[in-house]
Curated annotation (Swiss-Prot):
Keyword annotations of the record: Cytoplasm, Mitochondrion, Phosphoprotein
InterPro entries in alphabetical order: 14-3-3, 14-3-3_CS, 14-3-3_dom_sf, 14-3-3_domain
Species for this entry: Ovis aries (Sheep)
The protein's name in its UniProt record: 14-3-3 protein gamma
Phosphoserine modifications at: S48, S130, S150
Quaternary state and interactors: Homodimer. Part of a complex that contains DSG3, PKP1, YAP1 and YWHAG; the complex is required for localization of DSG3 and YAP1 to the cell membrane in keratinocytes. Interacts with SAMSN1. Interacts with RAF1, SSH1 and CRTC2/TORC2. Interacts with ABL1 (phosphorylated form); the interaction retains it in the cytoplasm. Interacts with GAB2. Interacts with MDM4 (phosphorylated); negatively regulates MDM4 activity toward TP53. Interacts with PKA-phosphorylated AANAT and SIRT2. Interacts with the 'Thr-369' phosphorylated form of DAPK2. Interacts with PI4KB, TBC1D22A and TBC1D22B.
Gene: YWHAG
Gene Ontology CC, one term: mitochondrial matrix
Molecular function (Gene Ontology), one example: phosphorylation-dependent protein binding
Role: Adapter protein implicated in the regulation of a large spectrum of both general and specialized signaling pathways. Binds to a large number of partners, usually by recognition of a phosphoserine or phosphothreonine motif. Binding generally results in the modulation of the activity of the binding partner. Promotes inactivation of WDR24 component of the GATOR2 complex by binding to phosphorylated WDR24. Participates in the positive regulation of NMDA glutamate receptor activity by promoting the L-glutamate secretion through interaction with BEST1.
Length: 158
């Protein structure tokens, strides 16, 4: 490819053979890079997918763990989801199924594990009217989450 580049810089018309050689040389150079890029892209997708799974399984553990163990698995889940999110933002289109699935599961984590628990812990500090409004909203959130997760399971064939 370097030799053919030098030939083109002479500003002389290329023969058919030279044009074909130039085309083949650059096709081979670009083809090797495209192949390398596909491998890297595949690795990034797999990494994001497995980190998402890791976050999911820690989230499942957080649903049943208590005390110090719960805090540890919540932190591990957050870390895995966060790493997967950073990789997917950098290497995947916003519409990529892995990236979208990650967004859904990460939002479930925030709802089920962090936000909902935080809200429940504060319910006893509310006055009666606020308590009713807050519990209604929390129930609507839980209903939406149930709907979203059942839709995702249907789409996954499960």
């Amino acid at each position: 490819a370097a030799a053919m580049k030098n030939v083109t810089e002479l500003n002389e018309p290329l023969s058919n053979e030279e044009r074909n050689l130039l085309s083949v040389a650059y096709k081979n150079v670009v083809g090797a890079r495209r192949s390398s890029w596909r491998v890297i892209s595949s690795i990034e997708q797999k990494t994001s997918f497995y980190l998402k799974m890791k976050g999911d399984y820690y989230r499942y553990l957080a649903e049943v763990a208590t005390g110090e163990k719960r805090a540890t698995v919540v932190e591990s889940s957050e870390k895995a989801y966060s790493e997967a999110h950073e990789i997917s933002k950098e290497h995947m289109q916003p519409t990529h199924p892995i990236r979208l699935g990650l967004a859904l599961n990460y939002s479930v984590f925030y709802y089920e594990i962090t936000a909902f628990d935080d809200a429940i812990a504060e319910l006893d500090t509310l006055n009666e009217d606020s308590y009713k409004d807050s519990t209604l909203i929390m129930q609507l959130l839980r209903d939406n989450l149930t709907l979203w997760t059942s839709d995702q399971q249907d789409d996954d064939g499960g």
